[in-house]
Amino acid sequence: MSTSFAELDPRINEPIIHDYFARLNQSDFIATANLFSEQGVLKPPFEKMITGRRAIAQYLEKEALGMKVFPIYIKTTMGDQNYTQYQVQGKVKTNYFAVNASWLINLNTTREIILVEIKLLESLSSLLELKHHPTFII
């Protein structure tokens, strides 16, 4: 079953946020990385920050293949004058498990992603169980 990003929550209407999740779900990791500014940062859970489009694309190709993300809720706040911040909550699914997650996404004034910070919203015991799953890397 294919669900478009917009079908999940019509209040989520920022095109760059839409494209980030849509391209990620299509496993189009180069296009996903190209939504970031040249020095944009991806901060995955339990990992060091990945900086730059090329490094982000390489990381996603290695770690996100087969994952689907389902954003459900978004809250927008103004950062300083240089960025807008979006807090998105939803799910990450693989063939083997699903977890609740949140994405903190900052867009600069030219509508490029400058930061995506991903957090898993699960209990420690649930995360430890996933750690032993062969397809989950933390």
What are these regions (language model features)?
Residues S2-S4, A57, E61-I138:
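A beta-strand edge to alpha-helix "cap/lid" segment located at domain peripheries
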Residues E14, H18, R54-A57, E61:
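Generic alpha-helical structural signal
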Residues Y20, T32-A33, G40, G52, ...:
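Hydrophobic pocket/interface hotspot
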Residues E38-Q39, Y96:
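Short hydrophobic/aromatic segments of transmembrane alpha-helices and their interfaces
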